[in-house]
């Protein structure tokens, strides 16, 4: 993995100036041959050239004569100034060491251009090969003229090193210019200070390279350390270029690696942050290295005139990419490595993103967006931000998709990565828009996890649900849970949750908000439940759902499906119980909550003896099934258009002033009444099918009766039952009891 370049050896030969692997520059005080001090403006003693602040200051000539001036040590002392006007200030060849001490200044102001000593313009400071330029704190190199071909510093050769703690400035040309044909070795810039152009308000080339004339290998290495500032655009040449930027540094303009060569950008730092706000182009690699620092790239990446692809690597720390990268060259991609975090959105993400190890590639999506690229690798991906992320690609990652905020929308299981990938919820939503099946293991953390299933579709989730958070179901479709789950509870706000084993709902409570729980097998549950609005329990034919926990809430409990729902808790739900299909079984009145009972071609089965004063409505036929040896006392009024049907070998005691219109059919056991009004509307008939009608009071009735099997009339001692209505049927009339 690439590592950050560390500063080399330091020394204190000049005020605040550190060296980078070069021979120390010696401050020369223009010593004479006999060692006596001879201060002047700029003087030469052997290979040493010293400029100080003595009069005349500034010095207005040129130090050096181009390629013939080599192996010199040139020192511009504190406060000294070289102002060369329409000419070079320093122009030397090979092997020179140049230093500007604190508050020194070297400048020119070229207005009438000329070829200069290297046919490269009248640059302020220029040199050929293997030179070292040290610019101390508060020192300044400036090209202050109007000629755009006159640069503040110009490389006309290779293996040169510039270290800047002061300011390098240009009013028209570049602050630093790289010009050479056949330059196979990089020139190097270490910046701790300011490198700037003031041309066009700072929106001009500040560090650049020549093009054409066969110059195809101009390489450059640029370091911008914390506190360093580069104002303007950096446009590198056609060689192999390396740019290393440390958190806390500033580059205001765009960054262009050049049309050829291998160009690499490193984003470094162990603390703090850095940001590049303008476009980055023509780089083969952009590498975020070192932990601790966060870098943000808000310009475009990879819109390369060279056509080469750009690979963005997040090796350590955090890299945030927010620009529009839709024009990135073909093959451009992003990779995040173990321990690092890459943040993108659907506009800034490149066509392929790979996450490895413990790395996380996060889509921070504040608005809705679609990503059609490919997500791969063994690492993790995350969804953050309130917006929706629609994934349409065939993704192959084997790590986790972490849903923290907003929605991830998918239409096929392969949008969620490999079949063995994972889902981790902590506040986010998975929205499925078509039928699909997934065996992915899922974790729901404290922030909860929402499954939104589109209407008319079913999401079969066979993987296990873990975690202490709550599963929330949205959408009109069906979420089928068949894993052995252990999550922290289930809230169904819309549609249906379907379970097929005792563990489908995890370890917590159930809440139904105008929604439905469907069971497809015999299931036993002890969890508490809440019904807000109608809460529907749908049980498949031939199956029983035993719900032994208490059920509360302001809503009604609605029973659908041909199967059986057994209620065993002390329930307080206020909206009543509506049985539209199948059977509800109870041991006690408290299991039916606080409201009325409605039976619509459905059954209430009592498994123990108890009495209730609740009202009941028979919208279709309503069956009361009493277990042998038990008595159900129903003293509340029973109304509705349907018939009351009695099954089971136990006894149903009716005590209300009932108005149900469909008559009374007793198919097993006994119905016991004390007065005619207990048997519903006066026009309603009674049918006995090998069953019994017991009267405990004296009364008469004109209602008809049918004995489809033997029909027993049991009259209590001391009472008389007067039956003036017609009695028909194939069965026998049997009289029991001591009454008349």
Place the predicted regions along the sequence by residue.
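N-terminal secretory signal peptides that target proteins for export/translocation
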Residues: 1-18
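Tight coil/turn sites that cap or link beta-strands
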Residues: 54-56, 77-79, 95, 103, ...
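Surface-exposed loop/turn positions within long extracellular repeat scaffolds
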Residues: 147, 200-201, 228-230, 245-252, ...
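Glycine-rich beta-solenoid repeat tracts in large extracellular/virion proteins
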Residues: 57-67, 86-94, 113-128, 148-157, ...
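Conserved consensus positions within extracellular tandem repeat modules
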Residues: 95, 103, 129, 158, ...
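Beta-strand-rich solenoid/repeat architectures in extracellular/passenger domains
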Residues: 48-61, 72-86, 99-120, 131-149, ...
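Extracellular repeat turn/loop positions enriched in glycine and acidic/polar residues, especially those
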Residues: 52, 77, 93, 101, ...
